[in-house]
């Protein structure tokens, strides 16, 4: 086996992106022979300081060159003769100049009078020519501004690696008619829950037409829900979870559309109601009305996930309370010992507005106190309990057309004595809170475990 001795000579390699048909022109694109020699010598001593630029238009002074990147190599340089395939002059390649950066945007100055004038005067370094150089200050339109290009247009030197790939969750399926279509194979199952509002004439009586047959697991949850809806036709999701086996938690939202519909407005908002049952036509449904509260809690508030309100303990995950689930000794009697309406109201349901808003103000006062880690103020509670129950027409006519200044004056009028500033402040806060409208879209984090009640 023949062996060759590697020479002690070391070389630098330049990977030029063009064809070297003309040797002189080839060297000019790299700045000339002297620039090449200087860059190669510097690469062996200090590679970071080696500068070699590629200029595809050497005669254009405004061309933006591409700088080479120097990399250390341990390659071999050989000379091969085609006649006899012999190998000679084996040497080492220690440094390589690579032009891998993207070329900058180029701007041609060939038709620029200002650049031509600049080159013929300042660049020749002639005193008389420089002395004659002047800039025309005549105003021109912006689109006709003639000026030299900037030294750099783009600061992006390397191309972006986008890695464009087809969505792995999307696939092509064949339809019954023979055509093909692209579908999301791993998409979230849609929950075909029927929703309704207080403006409809009749409530839904059966499930959605697009709802298919339930799976075995979903059917088990349905069978567990049937006796609950027979006993009580209107439920919140949290109340149902507390009456079901914990293993059914994930499947509840898929089982509810088979038995119930969802209210999106009115006094039964965000409650699931048994198909065919209309709480607007049954005064006994007053016990199933729901009260909503916007509570902004921090991470320190933790509690049992219950649907019952006792007025003493804060349960952060529950923001919706049904009347039948309120056991607070102060509030519960107000809901039981009251005269109901003859017809269901779109906002306050079967309760008269005066009693309804009094209960809501009491619950809000207690909830805000519990958030602060305190017990509700007896002064505030008694003030609400002793306040006159104003019907809705009188309640809003006094305040809707008044600003904050008029509100303060009204509070002072209600408290004729005006001797206790603390009581006045409490009344102002209570009235402001009572006038806050709690929209369905404003409820924040009604339930952390079940944000998507409708599905995608």
Curated annotation (Swiss-Prot):
Q: What does the UniProt PTM comment say about this protein? A: Phosphorylated.
Phosphoprotein as a keyword?
yes
Could you give one GO CC term from the UniProt record? transcription factor TFIIIC complex
Q: Which Gene3D superfamilies does the annotation name?
A: TFIIIC, subcomplex tauA, subunit Sfc1, barrel domain (3.30.200.160)
Write out the GO biological process terms: transcription initiation at RNA polymerase III promoter
What InterPro entries does its record include? TF_IIIC_su-5_HTH, TF_IIIC_Tfc1/Sfc1, Tfc1/Sfc1_N, TFIIIC_tauA_Sfc1
**Protein name (database record):** Transcription factor tau subunit sfc1
